[in-house]
Amino acid sequence: MPLLEIKNVDISYGKNVTVKNVSLDLNAGEICSIVGESGSGKTTVIRAVLGLIAGGGKVTAGDIIYEGRSLLKLTPAEWRDLRGHDISMIFQDSGAMMNQTRLIGDSYVEYILTHEDISKKDAWAKGVEVIERMRLPDGDRIMRSYPFQLSGGQRQRVGIAMGMTYQPKLLLADEPTSALDVTTQAQIVRQFMELRDEYGTSIIIVTHNLGVAAYMGDKIVVMKRGEVVDQGKREYILHQSENPYTKLLLDAVPTLGGKRYV
C-alpha cells in the first residue's frame, strides 16, 4: 500500500476549479518531483496534503489518503497530531516564515512545546541537537540568532531542521532551493537525499528546476494549468516521454557542448 495516495483531486476557490483531477501516489522512502510553470498548481497540491490550502481554497472532489486513512476527514485535533510528527513541510524561504523579531530558538522552542510536554530547557537542547544534525555547526549560536542574521542557506537548513524534528514519514518541500545560489542549492539537495537515505523519509518536492527534479526524483509529475499532463519514473520522463509539454520543458534546459545535463 502506498504511503500517500492523491486520488482524482479537484481544488476550488469558490466556483473556480484551479486544480483538476490530480492523481499521484508515493511509496515509503520514495521521492516524487512535481514540475511545471508558475501557476500550474504544484504548491496548491502539496498544501492540500497538509490541509493548508491558502486563500480559502478547498478540495472539492477526490480524496487524499495517508497510510490508509482519508486526510480530508481528519478533525482539528487529529491534524495537530499529524502535522510535524508524520507530515512536515519546508517552505520556499524558511527565513521569511519566521518571526524576524524573535530569536530562532524562541520560535523553535515554541514549536517543540506544541508537540511535547517537556521543559523549555529540554526543548532548547533538542533544537540545538537537531540543528547540528542538519550540519549547521554551533547550534546554540544559531538558536540565539535572529533570522536576518543568517544566510539564505543557513535559514533553509533551520527550516529543514524544524521539519525533521520528529523524523516525519513524509516531507513536503515547496521550491526549497529557488532562493539560493547554485552552490547552496547543491548542498540543500544533497541534504534532502541524505534524509531519505538515513531516515527513510518520503519526499515530495515542488520545483521549477528540472535539474533538481531529475536529480532527486524517483518519479516525476508534470503539471500544467492545474492538471497533471505527464508522470512516470525519472528515466521515462527524461528519455521516453512523448508528451509535448514535457518535451518543451526538457528543451528549455540549457545545453553545454550540445549536451543537456538532466
Which ranges hold each PLM region?
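A short, surface-exposed alpha-helical micro-motif characterized by mixed small hydrophobic
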Residues: 213-215
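A short, proline-enriched helix->beta-strand linker immediately N-terminal to the Walker B motif
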Residues: 165-169
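Conserved ABC ATPase "signature" region
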Residues: 70, 122-141, 250-251
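The feature captures the beta-strand-to-loop junction immediately N-terminal to the Walker
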Residues: 35-37
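ABC ATPase "signature
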Residues: 231-232
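Conserved ABC transporter NBD signature motif
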Residues: 58-70
